[in-house]
Amino acid sequence: MVVRSQARMVNQPHVPTGITARSLLLVSSGTVRKCEKESMMAKVIKKMTKWGLPAAKVTLAVSLAMSPLVTTQATAFDGLDGLDFGTFVQRGLERTSQVWFGVGKPLNASAAPSSVPYRTAAQNASAQVLIADGLKAEYVTRNAGNAADMFAFWPSDESPTHLIFCIEGGRQDLGTFLPGGMIRKFNPGVQRIKLSDGSVETILRGTIACDGIRRTAWQTILATEEASDGGAYEIINPLNVTNQTITDRTLGTIIDENGLPSTSIVKRTALPKMAWEGIGITPEGVVYAGDELRPGTLANADGGAMFKFVPANPRVGNSPIGSLSESPLTAGNVYALQVSCQSGSQQLGQGCEIGNGAWINVSAANARTDANTVGATGYYRPEDLELDDLFDGPGTRFCWTNTGLADGGNYGEVLCGVDSSPLTANATQRTVVVNRFVEGDQDMNQPDNFAFQPKTGNHYVIEDNPNGDIFACLPDGADRDIKTDGCVKILSVKDTSAEPTGFKFTADGKTAYLSIQHSDDTSMPKVDDYATDDIIKITGFRIPFRFQH
């Protein structure tokens, strides 16, 4: 580091080149004085603290300055004069990734483009993903339905026995019958995968683009469709339900294997009709979700709004329900988020994507058009959404991805909102504050999925790209800004025809699962008359010591 007296800046002598990181230079009153680095460290820390850097970054920078790597850097950058501080911190974050993320050396680059078709039956799991040092990939199954997307652990995140997956394929009659020969076989929409042996069974058929899926606190599964008329379906006892079929999506008619009306799955018409993906569900039954809509898709219409469903009868307690009629999702009201740049009132004109917000009442059946009519804030394709279980403030923190479009220089982002009163929704009460948390760039862009790592609170951002990457991002520290303190790349998909999706951690934060979605299956056999995807288990994540005590 070089410190110059501002009054004598023009007359300062040239700093000698070739000074190693074993020393620091202090230029003052026309004199160059050489000081041992150790004796100057307290002054360095004091100066960096004055700049407003958080303790983590100060410690990181100081530790790096003491390292042999900086000796080479200091010489190359003329006594640290030319070293870019952002690069300095980024390299340090990567070199100390075990401390901050619990993984070894991160990836320097994404996986190289592959030949097509890439996927074959002979490949092992490591052929599917490039991963950070210390991580290990293995197959859960290679027989999940093609376009396997998001999933929920069952019966819990702590001790899961199954993954309950949404399959994002279109509604399709497969040209044959279910066992028994009476019911036409449609595309798989919701599947369960047994973790002990990788066996796959279909729970529900006949959906359109099943995407967002969550386990509720009352032990049901909520599965949703990413379509302009996308519906939401609640499933009870998902391990005991097989091959049920939606025969009429508009009416929500669902039959079991014998052609009888289903008693295990119901369409929740009180929830908004829209293109669902990310979902956050509180124990009371409040549902947060976004409409995956690109601005301009509809004439003179904004992008997708963020919605909140408030149940008419909020759930009390955490015991499982005995029948679907007991669910808080049976009735309630739907609201769209309207964000303002002003405090206490709604500004005219363009408006803001960040700021303080209120919830505006809309109808469930016409949520998308109503949101545009009442002036709800539109975003660029809201996709995944997660609740922050480690948030300790009042209310609920929910974070979601806006995919953007990298080709247009819109690299996408992660936004986070804090709703101080989840059960409240009033156009005159600005109970929500929204801010950007991660902003995309030329390397990390078009974020699609999102996950919190339990224990650490680290945020994982998953791209919607060929050879898509997964980035681990630190929470915001005590520094001045309100964004992530830095991200590293920990995984990249090797198959150019596929993307990573559905990434989620078990409750201990040490194991994650993901889908290698919509790969080119030319060289792979069909299963149950349908193309397949690989589901991967990633182990080797370590919880940094500071979170263990």
Predicted regions and their residues:
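Short, Lys/Arg-enriched N-terminal segments with co-localized hydrophobic residues
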Residues: 19-40
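Gram-negative bacterial Sec-dependent N-terminal signal peptides
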Residues: 24, 41-71
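Sequence/structural signature of beta-propeller domains
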Residues: 75-549
